Design a protein with these regions (language model features):
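Catalytic glycan-binding domains that act on GlcNAc-containing polysaccharides
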Residues: 2-130
């Protein structure tokens, strides 16, 4: 279980275990905490592998087509491909932002260009609540 919630850490837990083995594998492959990947999936798609956002983001980790191309994702609705591609992208962002988790998560949500343009976390309500 991962402590998360709209008010911050500790207000609710993620109990969906369906993808735990895939998450653990991707976490080991990309040197990420499994809890981080699981929290992103919970926030992005609520564990719905068929989720599609208004912006066109797809799958468990809600990857937009341009990012899918960047990380080599062929089928965004395949949980294995999506979790590994989303985890790869998280690793890319963490490397780009020198391990700054807040900036990396904001970039995952709003796009890395928004972080650079805002000189930090952009003032979008969705990103601030992310």
């Amino acid at each position: 279980m991962v402590p998360i919630g709209p008010q911050g850490p500790g207000f609710s837990t993620i109990q969906n275990k369906r993808y735990d083995a895939l998450i653990a594998s991707a976490a080991a492959h990309y040197s990420l905490p499994a809890a981080l990947i699981k929290a992103v999936i919970a926030r992005e798609s609520a564990f719905n592998p068929k989720a599609v956002s208004k912006a066109g983001a797809q799958g468990l980790m809600q990857i937009i087509p341009a990012t899918a191309k960047e990380v080599g994702l062929k089928d965004p609705f395949d949980p294995v491909q999506n979790i590994f591609a989303g985890s790869r992208y998280l690793r890319i962002l963490l490397n780009r932002f020198d391990g700054n988790l807040m900036a990396s998560l904001a970039a995952y949500n709003a796009g890395p260009h928004q972080i650079k343009d805002a000189y930090g976390i952009p003032p979008f309500p969705e990103t601030l609540n992310y």
